[in-house]
Design a protein with these regions (language model features):
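Iron-sulfur cluster-binding electron-transfer modules in prokaryotic oxidoreductases
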Residues: 1-262
């Protein structure tokens, strides 16, 4: 994977919330904004944004994916970074949007320029903002043992597994547990879980059993698709495995939740 050059910390940024965050886990979007604003950024949310087109693309419908992606290209007109709280959606925008419009003399340059400004959340926090969370005023939070789940796209396409690890490991009171099936897919895979439910179900059962064997308090991930899949399966099985988006976890463990309640 080509090593990426990171820009200086900006004053403003866009949020591409993703459709799963918007519909199912809006708290993750709010906490992403809070994390960025606490670092001094003005965060902009273009209201016309929708899906990144990945479901259509991964189902073999590139024309539908092009239609969805084309509607987004002019929404992020300013030269600000586009922050995505999902490695899967960030990977689609950064790596596949330019391919979708490679033969389009108008949309192609736009897609390529936008892709260069797309950052997965943990990548942006660590390498662009270079965050050093101030936890000096955080007291009374119990220690936690967590499992960090990195989605397949985040791990293999965006290469952001180590970014999430670095952020979690920097938090006092947090023990990150590794497990045997850490690098395996959770079975979601977008439309894969719909097309192959039996295989998907077996994969997520393996993931849950392996994570629970560590005795962790919760599973943390930066991808809502994985969280929805693992969380639903764990509840269905009665497995003691709460799930939480990385943005919400970071905000909560660095005092954000306490400040809201004060």
């Amino acid at each position: 994977m080509k090593q990426r050059r990171y820009p200086p910390a900006p004053a403003q940024a866009y949020l591409f919330a993703t459709c799963l965050v918007d519909v199912f886990v809006p708290q993750a979007g709010l906490d992403t904004v809070r994390l960025l604003e606490r670092e001094g950024l003005a965060v902009h949310f273009p209201r016309g944004q929708s899906c990144c087109g990945q479901p259509a693309y991964s189902s073999g419908n590139p024309e539908q994916a092009r239609t969805v992606a084309l509607a987004q290209l002019d929404l992020f007109a300013e030269p600000w970074p586009v922050i995505v709280p999902s490695g899967s959606c960030a990977g689609m925008m950064r790596h596949h949007w330019p391919q979708l419009f490679a033969d389009d003399p108008v949309a192609g340059p736009k897609a390529f320029a936008l892709a260069e400004r797309v950052f997965e959340l943990s990548e942006f926090l660590l390498h662009v903002l270079k965050v050093r969370f101030d936890v000096s005023g955080v007291a009374g939070q119990p220690p936690e043992t967590v499992v960090l789940h990195t989605s397949c796209a985040a791990r293999r396409e965006m290469g952001t597994r180590d970014h999430g690890v670095a952020l979690v490991d920097a938090l006092p009171g947090i023990t990150r547990a590794e497990h045997q099936r850490e690098s395996e897919c959770c079975g979601f895979g977008g439309t894969f879980s719909l097309k192959h439910p039996d295989i998907s179900g077996a994969m997520v059962q393996d993931k849950i059993a392996s994570a629970c064997a560590t005795g962790c308090d919760r599973l943390v991930s930066a991808d809502c698709g994985c969280l929805l899949n693992i969380g639903h399966a764990a509840r269905h099985q009665g497995a003691p495995l709460p799930v939480e988006h990385l943005a919400t976890f970071l905000w909560r463990r660095t005092g954000g939740g306490a400040k809201e309640q004060a």
